[in-house]
């Protein structure tokens, strides 16, 4: 459990960075699809 507590912030930071990067790249290539109404 102690190893999980030390690894959790690192995994969360990498996950949020990857998600933000994917959203930025998607918005750069497809700017109209991100804000298109469903």
Swiss-Prot record:
Family assignment from sequence similarity: Belongs to the PsaJ family.
Pfam families membership: PSI_PsaJ (PF01701)
Main location: membrane
Transmembrane feature ranges: 4-24
Keywords for the protein's UniProt record, in alphabetical order: Membrane, Photosynthesis, Photosystem I, Thylakoid, Transmembrane, Transmembrane helix
Native organism: Synechococcus sp. (strain CC9605)
Gene Ontology biological-process entries: photosynthesis
Membrane topology: Single-pass membrane protein
Protein name: Photosystem I reaction center subunit IX
């Amino acid at each position: 459990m102690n190893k999980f507590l030390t690894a959790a912030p690192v995994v969360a930071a990498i996950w949020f960075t990857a998600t933000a990067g994917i959203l930025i790249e998607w918005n750069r290539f497809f700017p109209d699809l991100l804000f298109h109404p469903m």
